[in-house]
Regions:
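N-terminal membrane-sensor/transducer module of prokaryotic signaling receptors
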Residues: 2-157
Length: 157
């Protein structure tokens, strides 16, 4: 009888504690699925009200951990303000941007944004994570055209 009671108590404890004991903690970094979902949300916002959406992007309203949308003009390649503490390239031509390995990711971003609206292209390159450490790491960005803008969201691999 005592043995049955102990087994039942232990089983109940395991079932009660399992959801919290085995629950996954959210990652401090976003992933490809989350990046693409954020891009689609930002695109919908730009289509609804471009000026308001660009203000929201600059303020960081879309930002989630290390994920953030960014946009650039297709007419001149100028990068619009976006919420990244490492960003020093506002107003620069995206086509001039290169990673530490001299890969011209900006040219690839610009070319991806020339494709038909709604087509999403992924571009891989090296880029520092937001924060104090400026060491470049592998990153992939999803890029698409939204009217006269190229917009994207990247995640660290």
């Amino acid at each position: 009888m005592i043995r049955t009671f102990l087994i039942a108590t232990a089983s109940a404890a395991v079932l009660t504690l399992s959801p919290t004991a085995f629950a996954q903690q959210p990652s401090q970094y976003g992933n490809a699925v989350e990046a693409k979902a954020m891009l689609l949300k930002a695109v919908a916002s730009v289509k609804a009200d471009k000026t308001k959406a660009l203000d929201m992007i600059a303020r960081g309203d879309f930002k989630d951990r290390d994920l953030y949308p960014f946009c650039f003009n297709l007419s001149d390649g100028k990068i619009q303000p976006y919420a990244n503490p490492n960003a020093t390239n506002f107003g620069q031509d995206v086509r001039t941007q290169k990673d530490v390995n001299s890969k011209a990711w900006g040219v690839e971003f610009y070319a991806a944004a020339q494709k038909p609206e709604g087509q999403i292209t992924d571009v891989s390159y090296m880029f520092p994570k937001p924060g104090a450490d400026k060491t470049p790491v592998a990153k992939e960005s999803f890029i698409t055209r939204v009217g006269e803008l190229g917009c994207g969201v990247g995640y660290y691999k």
